[in-house]
């Protein structure tokens, strides 16, 4: 993706700018690469680097505020006038269209359309947040402003580069559009635009609800209801005015609408994207809150939106400012791997790394939402290994279907987080199903709800999710025919009681295991992801018959697996190292290999190193396998054994198989470490390794 960022000196959208973009596209075309164009000069999208507002100042991001009629400026844009009654504490009591006769407790207020004062991040140092020349954000709730935005950006790109569209150029990326803009002054205001009141009414609002958004309200229920209706109104208008306009343009020009909305839980907007997407930045999700953060739903929502709309791809813009809090350049290869596996476990199949910088030679560049996750970081020489890993797991998640035990109903108003946490921990698969998809895409067939390729026998509805009579009626049609619906905030007890699984993982300490059962090209696959720091061992139990193989996502190599046949099906012994994945595929045309009874178990002897860069150890002739292991590495270790390169360690588990390089008698190990780029661009962090151990395996080691 070509992303104009802070520090770009060439004038945005100038002829020189397009010459540079064309050069990039020609280079990509020669290499058979695909390119996504970015629709803004930084972000959020929608203003064309301020050009929309420069052409018509009325198209700046708008807001509604309440002003006493007697204080309303003569040039103010008054949209509505209400008579408001406040109690002695200044809280809203009543709203009238006309002054009640004989009651002077009502005061006339004008509801005035004004401006948010919001901006976007621009390209020059004086155009960043809070800077005097930050470009003005546009009123993206106004379809005329959005049309002007596409004229300045999309039409210009097509005018200059149309020969690449639908070939090298596959999409336009829109980035977290904001109705208020950044750094907006929203005290006593709400985002608004012309003719939005009709939408507000259609979403269930009344005059009292509108007033409750601008005045303190004693009744908390009224305040919550008003906020809910307002959020629904804004979402609806944003979808119609902004996303639909961009979607129509992209389809008319043979490219996909890509990017992501501003909120992690904005699932209703995702249906407008040809490639539903989200972003994982600013450590919104970490290893500690992977199942509990409100933002943890993002990747699953995008993947499930693609599943239900029939889109083959879904994306995630990831890694931006995901390093150590306060020291973002301290972002290790293992950190990157954890985030990748988090995304793959939830169905993501298009990774958009944030970001690759051509240069970090100045503080403006090196401090622009670090770290660089490409050419200016320590793993660049190994990036092909990382890219191939991404490619293989993206392939696995593309044009495959998962096997959900249940659908979890959701909307942009509420996406259940806590109720699904035990489902993840217990290995039950679910898909988020939006109310919009339930009502407009799903069919009730006998006792099931069917959406595209997915058939749901069980529907889980969080008791905190607002639903109306029409939704209840459609669910009821399924239930009266034998379908299962559970309305509660406790999902796991119901699922364990009512769902019978034929494929699952059985082991100890599996809370950090994510179990994914996929079907692709007629073959069953199992993606087992360890999101924790402790090795997980156990058994994959399945009724799937065929020749099983362990698929190495780093190399593409496969190795056959043997199963034990029991009354539960076929059982495969599996070990998933920390922060790692295990991919098991089954060829239904092959035959199951059964494990032999009484296979000898190798004994283990460990030799601890001194924690320095070199160590020696003695190896007997009866040793059959030798592994090198570290407790921790900061950040990349290059290993030599007996003077020969043994490999490079970037990720957990910090281990290497060095069997082929060892010899009977004395052996030497040399370790050199490359430290974090935080030591160059951020705050100093440790460089080195911990807990070096040589593990010797053999039949007679216990003797």
Model-identified regions with their sequence ranges:
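Carbohydrate-binding surfaces of carbohydrate-active enzymes
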Residues: 2-6, 12-45, 49-50, 58, ...
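Aromatic-lined ligand-binding clefts that engage carbohydrates, nucleic acids, or primary amines
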Residues: 617-642, 669-673
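Short, conserved beta-strand segments of beta-strand-rich sandwich/propeller modules, principally
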Residues: 583, 666-668
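Cys/His-rich Zn2+-binding cysteine-cluster or related metal-binding knuckle/ribbon modules and their
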Residues: 155
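Edge beta-strands of extracellular beta-sandwich domains
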Residues: 680-684
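Surface-exposed, short loops/turns at beta-strand junctions within beta-sandwich domains
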Residues: 661-664
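Acidic/aromatic-lined carbohydrate-recognition and catalytic surfaces
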Residues: 3-147, 151
């Amino acid at each position: 993706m070509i992303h104009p960022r802070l520090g770009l000196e060439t004038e945005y959208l100038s002829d020189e700018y397009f010459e540079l973009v064309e050069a990039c596209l020609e280079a990509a075309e020669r290499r058979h690469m695909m390119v996504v164009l970015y629709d803004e000069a930084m972000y959020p999208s929608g203003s064309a680097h301020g050009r929309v507002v420069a052409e018509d100042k009325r198209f700046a991001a708008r807001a509604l505020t309440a002003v006493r009629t007697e204080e309303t400026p003569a040039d103010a844009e008054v949209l509505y006038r209400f008579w408001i009654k406040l109690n002695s504490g200044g809280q809203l009591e009543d709203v009238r269209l006309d002054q009640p006769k004989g009651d002077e407790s009502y005061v006339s207020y004008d509801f005035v359309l004004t401006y948010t004062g919001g901006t976007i991040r621009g390209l020059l140092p004086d155009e960043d947040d809070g800077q005097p020349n930050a470009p003005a954000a546009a009123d993206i709730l106004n379809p005329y402003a959005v049309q002007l935005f596409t004229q300045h950006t999309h039409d210009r790109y097509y005018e200059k580069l149309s020969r690449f569209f639908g070939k090298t150029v596959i999409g336009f990326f829109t980035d977290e559009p904001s109705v208020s803009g950044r750094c907006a002054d929203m005290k006593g205001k709400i985002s608004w635009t012309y003719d939005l009141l009709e939408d507000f009414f259609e979403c269930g609002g009344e005059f009292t609800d509108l007033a409750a958004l601008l005045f303190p309200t004693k009744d908390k229920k009224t305040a919550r209801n008003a906020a809910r209706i307002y959020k629904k109104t804004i979402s609806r208008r944003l979808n119609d005015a902004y996303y639909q306009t961009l979607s129509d343009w992209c389809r008319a020009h043979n490219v996909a609408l890509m990017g992501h909305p501003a909120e992690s839980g904005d699932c209703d907007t995702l249906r407008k994207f040809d490639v539903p997407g989200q972003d994982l930045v600013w450590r919104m999700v970490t290893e500690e809150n992977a199942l509990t953060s409100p933002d943890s739903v993002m990747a699953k929502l995008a993947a499930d939106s693609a599943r239900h709309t029939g889109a083959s791809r879904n994306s995630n813009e990831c890694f931006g400012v995901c390093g150590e809090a306060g020291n973002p350049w301290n972002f290790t290869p293992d950190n990157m791997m954890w985030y990748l596996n988090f995304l793959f476990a939830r169905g993501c199949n298009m990774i958009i790394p944030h970001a690759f910088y051509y240069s970090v030679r100045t503080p403006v560049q090196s401090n622009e939402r670090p770290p660089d996750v490409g050419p200016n970081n320590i793993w660049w020489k190994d990036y092909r290994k990382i890219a191939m890993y991404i490619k293989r797991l993206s392939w696995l998640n593309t044009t495959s279907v998962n096997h959900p035990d249940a659908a979890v109903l959701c909307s942009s108003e509420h996406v259940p987080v806590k109720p699904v946490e035990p489902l993840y921990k217990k290995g039950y698969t679910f898909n988020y199903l939006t109310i919009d998809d339930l009502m407009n895409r799903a069919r009730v067939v006998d006792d099931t709800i069917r959406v595209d390729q997915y058939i749901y026998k069980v529907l889980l509805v969080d008791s905190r999710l607002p639903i109306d009579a029409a939704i209840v009626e459609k669910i009821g049609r399924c239930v009266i025919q034998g379908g299962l619906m559970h309305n509660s905030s406790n999902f796991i007890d119901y699922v364990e009681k009512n769902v019978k699984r034929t494929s699952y993982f059985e082991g100890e300490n599996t809370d950090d295991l994510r179990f994914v059962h996929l079907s692709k090209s007629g073959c069953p696959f199992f993606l087992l992801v360890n999101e924790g720091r402790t090795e997980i061992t156990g058994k994959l139990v399945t009724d799937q018959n065929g020749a099983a193989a362990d698929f190495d996502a780093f190399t593409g190599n496969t190795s056959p697996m043997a199963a034990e046949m029991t009354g539960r099906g076929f059982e495969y012994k599996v070990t998933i190292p920390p922060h790692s994945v295990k991919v098991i595929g089954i060829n239904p045309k092959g035959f199951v290999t059964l494990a032999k009874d009484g296979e000898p178990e190798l004994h283990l002897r460990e030799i601890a190193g001194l924690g320095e860069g070199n160590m020696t150890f003695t190896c007997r002739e009866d040793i059959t396998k030798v592994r090198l292991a570290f407790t921790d590495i900061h950040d990349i270790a290059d290993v030599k054994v007996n003077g020969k390169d043994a490999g490079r360690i970037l990720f957990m588990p910090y281990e290497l198989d060095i069997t082929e390089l060892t010899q009977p008698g004395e052996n030497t190990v040399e370790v050199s470490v490359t430290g974090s780029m935080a030591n160059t661009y951020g705050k100093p962090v440790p460089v080195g390794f911990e807990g070096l151990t040589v593990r010797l395996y053999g039949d007679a080691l216990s003797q």
